[in-house]
């Protein structure tokens, strides 16, 4: 039995499964949560907490129907929050791996780099990698390679938002817009919350 599971897959109560089905929409290929539409323009798409919650539930359900991960790994930093939420919904252990194009908030490279060791717990296990967005797929490919090299038995990928040509194994919404996540919209400056300057041209 995978560590962190309550029992064999499918052993959750019928009520719990029905509740999850009711609260998500499975009518579209990308499992878009009900009542929400991705902005088709290439502007900014502000993600509210209710959308993030529904999207996470829908994405977790999509994963569970096709894959049974034993461990969820979020790509730090932006993939940690969706990764932890997906892990909680799936009732699986959660770890993270640091991959970035930046160092101390300053761009230092054109391609992402693995900045920390892969979690040792991936050895011999089925793993789901989670990130918030993917466009070129460079970060996800690096993460997959790092976990395979660390001994993972099988690795699949999931993102909340697919924003480019790369196709992860699972995604929530597909949009060409710049994603503004609810936890990234404001930052603390001199003790006050102010709009994140990287979105100041919105």
Per-region residue spans from a language model:
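PRPP-associated nucleotide enzymes
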Residues: 2-202
